[in-house]
Amino acid sequence: MKFLILNCLILFSLISSEATNVKLDREDQNHLVLLNEKNFEKLTQASTGATTGTWFVKFYAPWCSHCRKMAPAWESLAKALKGQVNVADVDVTRNLNLGKRFQIRGYPTLLLFHKGKMYQYEGGERTVEKLSEFALGDFKNAVGAPVPQPLSLFALVSDFVVSGVNEALRVYDAALAGFVTISSFSFLFGLLVGLMLSLFLFTRRATRKPKVLTERKKDK
């Protein structure tokens, strides 16, 4: 009985140790921070104090080929800057409000947040070396902009209403254009059919008159 209990304890210790090692390995491999609408401000404190350090954030879309191309360099950058600069990702297609807040117009957009200001990386090369130089000091040569506040409930509702109105107008314009096109086609088609029918009747009458005259001459 004691032997069985001892074996169980040893087995449990081995499993716990293995699970801990796997967890540590995964944490060590995962250097990128995944940000979303729920945790962005809490983790970055971009507009509320910036006590969590400097953040270098990539705003991307899954379908963007340039984003996929630079992914290995971005992951290497996160590993190289660990403990100095927080490197993170934001999938804008799943976090539309963050895209609106920071006015993301293209992918990838790289923004560095430092002490209440944000700096956009506009360098042509997206190598680990160039990105690292920017994150560790070269960003100061760029023009910084104040970090916009999180979108308020009023702003979200207003944007929803405006988007709804714009979509309704787009549908109306498309429907109106379709109606005009179909109406014009129907009118022209009807006109063409009418002309063909009139021509057919006129031709038929013209061919029947001589026959009637011929029959009358025979009667005389």
Curated annotation (Swiss-Prot):
UniProt xrefs under CDD domains? PDI_a_family (cd02961)
Looking at the record, the residues that make up the Thioredoxin domain are 20-141
Topological domains, Lumenal: 20-181
Q: Which PROSITE patterns match?
A: THIOREDOXIN_2
Record topology, Cytoplasmic segments: 203-220
Name one process (GO BP) from the record.
Answer: response to endoplasmic reticulum stress
Protein's name according to its UniProt entry:
Thioredoxin domain-containing protein
Q: Which organism is it from?
A: Theileria parva
